[in-house]
Amino acid sequence: MQLEKMITEGSNAASAEIDRVSTLEMCRIINDEDKTVPLAVERVLPDIAAAIDVIHAQVSGGGRLIYLGAGTSGRLGILDASECPPTYGVKPGLVVGLIAGGEYAIQHAVEGAEDSREGGVNDLKNIGLTAQDVVVGIAASGRTPYVIAGLEYAHQLGCRTVGISCNPGSAVSTTAEFAITPVVGAEVVTGSSRMKAGTAQKLVLNMLSTGLMIKSGKVFGNLMVDVVATNEKLHVRQVNIVKNATGCSAEQAETALIACKRNCKTAIVMVLKNLDADEAKKCLDQHGGFIRKALEKE
């Protein structure tokens, strides 16, 4: 696909005079364009749902969710992956973010990194990619060699693959088994795909990881019941989670959390089923960590 023919490289008529307007009008133009992004994502919800189901199936079988991208796309993958352990209590290696150019590229531009097909393959080899894993290639343009080569390598190993781009019919879309293509149109600043395209990618990644965690029993109602209390704010959140899930007092919630070494799931089952910490943990373990299943047990 030629660069000048890509939607993400097109000229946006709405912002053609943005350098001549007031600061407030500038913000309005950007905001008006941003409003279109959730609608673009809405149009690909069935594709996102299909990807979530595949990711959940693979992760349930011992696989990992691996994001692969360059520049903004790679940074968004790393951001999403890094939030999963504290939010959902999963091991750091379960959701992995890889970026062309390595760790240095998180904060700096690495010239030519996205053009390295070898880099995409080697980065996946270095984390021991297996057929159980799911590789999600992220590229707004859909033409990034680093990502395309990584998806091709993953396919050769038998991995399930997902491609996220913002240009229909792109190489990323056609290389991946599952294509998610929110078409957000031309950017306010021509070609600056960190803007609308990046926002769309972030919304999609939010859904992929959150959907995986919900289907894995990491959410009860809408509560993040596997949150790890790494600071005072999260200690308070744990108490509130147990309170909201059970209707108990803050004191009862804190007592239960202390007894079970601050595991919200265990504390909730303790309170609702009147069990001690060991009994509640055993009950949860017998039901795969799903609170609802544990509560349904007679």
Swiss-Prot record:
Gene for this chain: murQ
Q: List the disulfide bonds.
A: none
> Matching NCBIfam families, A to Z?
N-acetylmuramic acid 6-phosphate etherase (TIGR00274), PRK05441.1 (NF003915), PRK12570.1 (NF009222)
What is the reaction catalyzed? N-acetyl-D-muramate 6-phosphate + H2O = N-acetyl-D-glucosamine 6-phosphate + (R)-lactate
Query: Under what name is this protein listed?
Result: N-acetylmuramic acid 6-phosphate etherase
GO annotations under biological process?
A: 1,6-anhydro-N-acetyl-beta-muramic acid catabolic process; amino sugar catabolic process; N-acetylmuramic acid catabolic process; peptidoglycan turnover
List the source organism: Escherichia coli (strain SMS-3-5 / SECEC)
Q: Outline the subunit composition.
A: Homodimer.
UniProt function note = Specifically catalyzes the cleavage of the D-lactyl ether substituent of MurNAc 6-phosphate, producing GlcNAc 6-phosphate and D-lactate. Together with AnmK, is also required for the utilization of anhydro-N-acetylmuramic acid (anhMurNAc) either imported from the medium or derived from its own cell wall murein, and thus plays a role in cell wall recycling.
Q: Which InterPro entries match?
A: Etherase_MurQ, Glucokinase_regulatory_CS, MURQ/GCKR, SIS_dom, SIS_dom_sf
Q: Which GO terms describe its molecular function?
A: carbohydrate derivative binding; carbon-oxygen lyase activity; ether hydrolase activity
- Spell out the Pfam families in the cross-references: GKRP-like_C (PF20741), GKRP_SIS_N (PF22645)
Additional detail: A lyase-type mechanism (elimination/hydration) is suggested for the cleavage of the lactyl ether bond of MurNAc 6-phosphate, with the formation of an alpha,beta-unsaturated aldehyde intermediate with (E)-stereochemistry, followed by the syn addition of water to give product.
Give the record's family classification: Belongs to the GCKR-like family. MurNAc-6-P etherase subfamily.
Give residue ranges for domain SIS.
Answer: 55-218
In the Enzyme Commission scheme, what number(s) does this protein have? 4.2.1.126
Ordered alphabetically, the record's keywords are: Carbohydrate metabolism, Lyase
Gene3D superfamilies this protein is in? 1.10.8.1080, Glucose-6-phosphate isomerase like protein, domain 1
Write down the PROSITE patterns for this protein, in alphabetical order. Answer: GCKR, SIS
Q: Copy out the induction comment.
A: Induced by MurNAc 6-phosphate that releases the repressor MurR from the DNA. Repressed by MurR in the absence of MurNAc 6-phosphate.
**Catalytic positions?**
E83 (proton donor), E114
Pathway noted in the entry? Amino-sugar metabolism; 1,6-anhydro-N-acetylmuramate degradation; Amino-sugar metabolism; N-acetylmuramate degradation; Cell wall biogenesis; peptidoglycan recycling
